[in-house]
Regions:
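Transmembrane alpha-helical segments in multi-pass inner-membrane proteins
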Residues: 190, 194-241
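Helix-loop-helix "hairpin" substructures at the membrane interface of multi-pass membrane proteins
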Residues: 19, 130-202
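Short loop segments and helix-boundary regions at transmembrane helix junctions
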Residues: 28-111, 207-219, 235-240
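Membrane-interfacial amphipathic/re-entrant helices at transmembrane-helix boundaries
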Residues: 1-21
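Alpha-helical transmembrane segments in multi-pass membrane proteins
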Residues: 15, 19-23, 49, 53, ...
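Conserved small/polar residues in nucleotide/adenosyl-binding loops
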Residues: 242-250
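Hydrophobic alpha-helical transmembrane segments
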Residues: 13-17, 61-66, 91-92, 131-136, ...
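Transmembrane helix-bundle core of multi-pass membrane transporters
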Residues: 6-11, 82, 90-147
């Protein structure tokens, strides 16, 4: 069966490519700057925005984006305080987001929402709106890193040296935290909260085994991430198809 004839599969392929580009770019900064734990905190904090959106009757993705960006700024601000440890600030927003998400989800009017769609995602259900969101984000990240690759590399490896070069480190760090939050939210419907952090770290860690160049890690991460998504799509199809046929046979018998 030719899978490429189906619109949902075409969307899945294009979404995989766009998500790999966005995650490959910002994920390289995350791994180099050692922000993996912070990114995990923002990922789980986004659940609070999802619950708030379900409760208020607005788009969960929109509310998750706002909540995630504010959480990212909050973590960045608290981590700069001398009386607050960075890991403690992350834990605050991590637990707060999950708690609010669960509470608002079950308080939302009507039927209980299906949270598995946001926790685990479903790459075959992404639509044109999701693709536009991923495409715009990938374009913004590409342009931002193309224009400011040098100060970003300086900040990723040595913030004090970056300050000595008159680079506005704080502004860049807040902007990059915003991009991290938006990338996480853009990938929620595709891979979910549980696996979003994987696209932001595993391809980059794998690429780092072969090169130490920041730019090369970005390119390799995009390729590795896209191949991983393709592998998951083409491997899962025959497994799902076999399971479906077995279920149909059992039902017939």
């Amino acid at each position: 069966m030719n899978l490429l004839q189906y619109t949902f599969f075409q969307h899945a392929l294009l979404g995989s490519l766009l998500a790999s580009i966005a995650c490959g770019i910002i994920g390289t900064y995350i791994v180099t700057r050692r922000l993996v734990f912070i990114s995990g905190g923002i990922t789980h904090a986004s659940f609070g925005g999802i619950g708030l959106g379900l409760f208020a009757g607005i788009s969960p993705i929109l509310s998750a984006a706002v909540f995630s960006v504010l959480s990212a700024f909050g973590v960045e601000w608290l981590s700069r305080r001398k009386d607050m440890r960075e890991d403690s600030a992350i834990a605050v927003f991590w637990t707060l987001g999950m708690a609010l998400g669960i509470m608002f989800s079950f308080l939302s009017p009507g039927f209980a929402p299906d949270l598995s769609a946001y926790l685990f995602g479903n790459i075959l259900t992404i639509n044109q709106t999701d693709l536009w969101m991923l495409g715009i984000l990938a374009l913004l990240l590409t342009g931002f890193f193309y224009l400011f690759i040098r100060p970003i590399v300086y900040i990723a490896f040595d913030r004090e040296f970056a300050r000595s070069q008159k680079i506005p480190v704080e502004i860049f760090e807040y902007l990059l935290m915003m991009f991290i939050a938006l990338t996480i939210v853009a990938c929620l419907r595709m891979v979910g909260i549980v696996l979003a952090i994987s696209l932001l770290t595993i391809p980059q860690m794998t690429a780092n085994l072969f090169t130490y160049s920041f730019k090369k890690i970005i390119w390799l991460s995009i390729g590795i991430g896209f191949l991983g998504c393709l592998g998951g799509l083409f491997i899962s199809y025959p497994v799902s198809y076999t399971h479906l046929r077995a279920h149909e046979t059992d039902s017939y018998l």
